[in-house]
Amino acid sequence: MKKLLIIILIAGITGMSCSHKQAATIPGISDADVLHQNEDQLTQLIIYDVFTPPVASRIYAYASLASYEAIRFQKPEYESLTNQLKGFEPMPEPDKSKKYDFTLAATEAFFTIAKKVTFSLDSLKEYESTVHARFKNAVGDSVYNRSIAFGDQIAQVIVKRLIKDNYLQTRGKPKFLGSEDPGKWRPTPPDYLDGVEYCWGTMKTFALDSSDRIPVPAPPKYSEDKNSEFFKQNVAVYEQSKTLTDEQKDIARYWDDNPFVMEHAGHMTFANKKITPGGHWIGITAIACKQTKADAVKTAQAYALTAVGM
């Protein structure tokens, strides 16, 4: 999976250029930096709302696709991604005789979607208002209103797809409590946490028809025989856990997929909220784009491809 995401990321930040009529941008900040700040704001919200890694990946995907589909008109040689994915209606196109600020349109599309798929909207709306005010001071009213309207049109096409991806139906499923049968998953002490997104396999996919397209070797069968592969692998993990270096512990914590980590100290238990693995991939995308000095359209494409790949 990491190799696949790296390939997608590299594809998303390689070359292109030419232009639709683009209005003035915010003084003192590049269009690409606006997109980076938008994604970072979404990451902070995902942490605050404690979304699981699968749900976080869905949030990033829809919001980042909306952003890209709006800003790609800044460079017409960039093609639509949604028309290459499953279940999306055709995207609207801007009036070629009118001026737009496509970064503003992308921001509007991004946060229209973000508000549909997250909970804690106060901080999001506050940030969005600040960004809108900065754009309003940089472009005329007609360009501002036209760009906002275009971003909203893009978002509405994304909304039509996200309400039909089976996510809402999976919210009504009973908790997965596991099984007491040997070798089956069940909640374990000390926290007895629920199983995570056990119905995720019923979600409508973006690209693959079936997971069979990417065959994965079956894990070793459960066995309590000390000579079995299953037993040996578990012992190996246990033995290594006793000799971990501080660096190895930091790496493990960094990629830990639990956004709500329970900590235990004697009789005291407390929880820490933290970034999901998907959030790390979005952060890595930001680093790659900044290091390669990717422009705004290339940056939006990289975020969208990475998020869909998750």
Give a label for each model feature.
Residues 1-2, 20:
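Generic cytosolic/nucleocytoplasmic N-terminal low-complexity/intrinsically disordered segments
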Residues 2-8:
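Sec-dependent signal peptide recognition
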Residues 14-17:
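C-terminal motif of bacterial Sec signal peptides marking the signal peptidase cleavage site
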Residues 19-310:
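Acidic/polar surface patches and capping/hinge elements
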